[in-house]
Regions:
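N-terminal secretory signal peptides and thylakoid transit peptides that target proteins
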Residues: 2-19
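Cleavable N-terminal signal peptides
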Residues: 20-21, 31
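Loop-centered beta-sheet repeat module
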Residues: 184-193
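Short, glycine-/small- and polar/acidic-enriched structural segments
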Residues: 34-170, 175-178, 194-200, 215-216, ...
Length: 290
């Protein structure tokens, strides 16, 4: 991503913008403008894909924050966004790892003292609902009476609901099976579920390993942006450490810029951690994910 073009991995700014501001889930301007911090260490979560993984593996992110006297501690890997939100609210981590906004909103609605600090948009939008080639499921309407693995209150469930609504399928006619990604993949492979709603790289690996195909692809079949990648911390941490939050936001922005300018190298880094095939990696390189 060039400095002149944020249309791909577009940082929508700090929490003064985006859906957090619309929902009243951000700090006031005065809080963001306050100087200082009460800690020199930030505990960040990471998973086996995405911006935080690349930041952790490359090391440039930590060096940039070290210039401000900030030490980074990495916690993980986590399978998806929701457990990182639990780590933040439980006090064992300071930031969620940059995941789906849907579980974040669900947590806030349930009373978690979280605030958004930053939003990211990825292109292409590759979240998909897939089924094995031998399943007889070829379109959304074929899901009636079938079971679909989704992560509860996460992007997988959100996409499935959107697909059913678009195709006018009553959600009560489809069985939602709540599984985290590490459990959903073998469930699809063994036939314990009929389909899986999932994001990259899990969905891409499953297509090849389990001979699966798309029923519904977000970027192709959905006309609107269904979700944002979001970062959250507790309101207390943000209020006490606004300078640190700004520094972390800036460091992630710099990492995103590097990824957009070095997408092929980034894919090799992601593959090493994700342990998927060269074929999947080469597909990602061809996509020029940003």
């Amino acid at each position: 991503m060039s400095s002149d073009d944020f249309s791909r991995r577009q940082f929508l700014g700090t929490a003064a913008f985006g859906i957090g501001a619309l929902a009243g889930l951000t700090l006031t301007d005065d809080a963001w403008a306050a100087p200082g911090r009460v800690t020199d260490t930030v505990r960040l979560t990471w998973g086996l894909s995405g911006l935080n993984l690349i930041a952790k593996e490359r090391g440039a992110f930590e060096k940039l924050l070290a210039q401000d006297g900030i030490k980074v501690e990495w916690l993980g890997p986590f399978p998806n966004h929701a457990p990182t939100l639990q780590a933040v609210t439980g006090g064992t981590a300071d930031f969620s790892f940059g995941g789906s906004t849907t579980p974040a909103l669900a947590a806030i609605i349930a009373g978690s003292p979280l605030v958004f600090t930053q939003f990211v948009v990825y292109e292409p939008r590759t979240t998909a609902i897939i089924a094995r080639d031998d399943s007889g499921i070829n379109k959304v309407e074929d899901l009636v009476g079938k079971s679909v693995a989704v992560n509860r209150s996460g992007l997988g469930e959100f996409l499935l609901v959107a697909a059913l609504e678009k195709h006018k399928v009553d959600r009560s006619k489809v069985k939602f099976v709540y599984l985290n990604p590490p459990d959903a993949a073998p469930a699809l492979a063994s036939g314990k579920v009929d389909a899986w709603s999932m994001w990259s790289p899990g969905v891409d690996i499953a297509r090849l390993d389990y001979k699966a195909h798309d029923i519904f692809l977000e970027g192709r079949d959905l006309e609107f942006q269904i979700d944002y990648t979001s970062y959250l911390t507790t309101r207390k941490f943000a209020a006490e450490n606004p300078a640190l939050v700004r520094a972390v936001n800036d460091a992630f922005r710099a990492e995103g810029k590097w990824i957009s300018e070095n997408s092929k190298e980034a894919e090799y880094i992601a593959q090493k951690a994700g342990k998927y095939s060269d074929q999947v990696r080469d597909q990602f390189i061809a996509m020029n994910r940003q």
